[in-house]
């Protein structure tokens, strides 16, 4: 099973109240006069639709692309509740999709904290999709007072893409872009079993095989996790 399919059941879902990252991003996009109304949009690595469903309420149409079927099923369920009919669902990787849709054009190409773009070819294809490209990614190492000690014990680290990513490609190719960096701190409460499952998922993503028993020392009971992130918004 796709690891992101496993993550779907515990992944954040759409909420009409914007989260901190969304609030700060939309505020900055508004300053740049970016308008989503009546636009044709693609949301790459859309997940459960946390952004998709908000954008769809203004867009003419939106393509929701994700390689995790379970994520898209949640998105569809929430879209039905909101009676949104302008969403096209694509269950595949970005590379698979672009190979079948090489001439596709949108008003806005959007990606938020997703590993969907893997290499320079993907970056170039992302750029070619639309006149306006919006990219949200990690600006630095994401800190977690729960996961970091576990990562250290297993001799690994947070693997979110932030050292070499789309920004590196834009700089190498002298592509001008607007950059805005902001912080986000959130506190997540998890039951013991959920915390262990979350830690195992992150270790698995890093190629580390561990068991529930291996994590018993770190998770004595329910936990309260503080996550500190530095996010960057690129618009070009």
Protein language model features and the residues they cover:
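Conserved beta-strand signature within the Rossmann-like core of class I S-adenosyl-L-methionine
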Residues: 131-142
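Class I SAM-dependent methyltransferase SAM/SAH-binding core
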Residues: 48-96
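Short conserved loop adjoining the S-adenosyl-L-methionine
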Residues: 96-103
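Conserved Class I S-adenosyl-L-methionine
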Residues: 178-236
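Short alpha-helix
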Residues: 159-174, 178-180
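Conserved class I S-adenosyl-L-methionine
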Residues: 1-35, 39-47
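A short, conserved alpha-helix within the catalytic core of class I
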Residues: 116-129
């Amino acid at each position: 099973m796709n690891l992101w399919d496993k993550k779907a059941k515990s992944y954040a879902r759409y909420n009409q109240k914007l989260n901190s990252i969304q609030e700060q991003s939309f505020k900055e996009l508004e300053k740049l006069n970016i308008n989503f109304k009546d636009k044709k949009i693609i949301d790459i690595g859309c997940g459960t639709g946390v952004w998709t469903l908000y954008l769809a309420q203004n867009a003419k149409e939106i393509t929701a692309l994700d390689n995790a079927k379970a994520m898209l099923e949640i998105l569809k369920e929430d879209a039905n509740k909101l009676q949104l009919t302008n969403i096209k669902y694509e269950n595949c990787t970005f590379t698979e999709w672009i190979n079948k849709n090489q001439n596709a054009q949108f008003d806005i190409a959007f990606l938020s904290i997703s590993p969907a773009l893997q290499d320079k070819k993907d970056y170039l294809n992302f750029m070619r999709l639309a006149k306006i490209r919006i990219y949200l990614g990690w600006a630095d190492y994401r800190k977690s007072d729960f996961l970091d000690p576990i990562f250290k014990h297993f001799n690994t680290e947070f693997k979110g893409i932030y050292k070499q990513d789309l920004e590196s490609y834009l700089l190498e190719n002298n592509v001008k872009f607007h950059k805005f960096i902001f912080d986000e701190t959130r506190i997540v409460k998890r039951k013991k079993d959920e915390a262990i499952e979350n830690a195992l998922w992150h270790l698995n993503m890093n190629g580390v095989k561990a068991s529930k028993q291996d994590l018993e020392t770190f998770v004595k009971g329910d936990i309260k996790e503080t996550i500190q992130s530095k996010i960057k918004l690129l618009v070009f």
